[in-house]
């Protein structure tokens, strides 16, 4: 395994560990999710470029589209929770149920 792959895997694992450890605040959870998506994007791009897979070259861009949608929905939920309750705790998400 080359150094680039190992660095990207470590970035993904650190983001996953941060998501598991600091899940009380919504903003930190969203930042960890973005770190995971960014490391996945870089890993997929490097793998596709190294293996010369021309048919799979759209997959990282599709991943970025889903990451942008996830970020927009997460930030809108963060704004809604913080304006309603005044704090961004993840435990407030259970209160949003009808």
UniProtKB/Swiss-Prot annotation:
The chain crosses the membrane at residues 1-21, 29-49, 61-81. PANTHER family: NADH-UBIQUINONE OXIDOREDUCTASE CHAIN 4L, NADH-UBIQUINONE OXIDOREDUCTASE SUBUNIT ND4L. Belongs to the complex I subunit 4L family. It is a multi-pass membrane protein. It is found in: Mitochondrion inner membrane. This is NADH-ubiquinone oxidoreductase chain 4L. GO terms for molecular function: NADH dehydrogenase (ubiquinone) activity. GO terms for cellular component: mitochondrial inner membrane; respiratory chain complex I. One of its GO terms (biological process) is ATP synthesis coupled electron transport. Its main location: mitochondrion. Core subunit of the mitochondrial membrane respiratory chain NADH dehydrogenase (Complex I) which catalyzes electron transfer from NADH through the respiratory chain, using ubiquinone as an electron acceptor. Part of the enzyme membrane arm which is embedded in the lipid bilayer and involved in proton translocation. It holds the Pfam family Oxidored_q2. The keyword Transmembrane helix applies. Keywords: Electron transport, Membrane, Mitochondrion, Mitochondrion inner membrane, NAD, Respiratory chain, Translocase, Transmembrane, Transmembrane helix, Transport, Ubiquinone. Core subunit of respiratory chain NADH dehydrogenase (Complex I) which is composed of 45 different subunits. It catalyses: a ubiquinone + NADH + 5 H(+)(in) = a ubiquinol + NAD(+) + 4 H(+)(out). Its EC number is 7.1.1.2. It comes from Uroderma bilobatum (Tent-making bat). Gene3D superfamilies: 1.10.287.3510.
């Amino acid at each position: 395994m080359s150094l680039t792959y190992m660095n990207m895997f470590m970035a993904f694992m650190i983001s996953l560990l941060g998501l598991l450890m600091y899940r009380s605040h919504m903003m930190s959870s969203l930042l960890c999710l973005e770190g995971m998506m960014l490391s996945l994007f870089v890993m997929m791009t490097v793998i596709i470029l190294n293996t010369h897979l021309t048919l799979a070259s759209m997959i990282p861009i599709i991943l970025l589209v889903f990451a942008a949608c996830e970020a927009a929905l997460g930030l809108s939920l963060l704004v809604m929770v913080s304006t309603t309750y005044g704090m961004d705790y993840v435990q407030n998400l259970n209160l949003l149920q009808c």
